[in-house]
Amino acid sequence: MMRNMAGMMKKVQEMQSRMEALQQEMADTEFTASVGGGAVTVIVTGKGEMRGVKIDPAAIDADDVSILEDMICLATNNARGEADSAMAARMKDITGGLPLPPGMS
């Protein structure tokens, strides 16, 4: 019984180490999304931090900035969605598909 427990603890420690490495890797990885035919491009990290926004000057309409605002929001959400999907796929590889307790992602 103690051998099983020791083996299980070792596996948990290995999984935790791999998860920490993944979190660092994701923090350094950039995800890009463009909308409006490239009018707006947003770059975020795997942790969701925005690294950059590129706006085609032709997309700027001083009389109606709401379209530009919507495109920025959409591009940001798309880039974050890509980052979240990548993180979920990598976490599934690490955990073997086991659900994680809340707060361990």
Protein language model annotation of sequence segments:
Residues M1-T32, E82-S105:
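Long amphipathic alpha-helical segments used for membrane anchoring, targeting, substrate engagement
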Residues V12, G48, I72:
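Residue-level signature of catalytic and energy-coupling elements of molecular machines
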Residues D28, S34-G38, V42-K54:
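N-terminal intrinsically disordered, cationic/polar leader segments
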Residues G38-T41, G52, L74, L98, ...:
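Alpha-helix boundary/capping detector
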Residues P57-I60:
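A short acidic/small-residue loop/turn micro-motif
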Residues M71, A75-A86:
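Stable alpha-helical structural segments in soluble proteins, enriched in small hydrophobic residues
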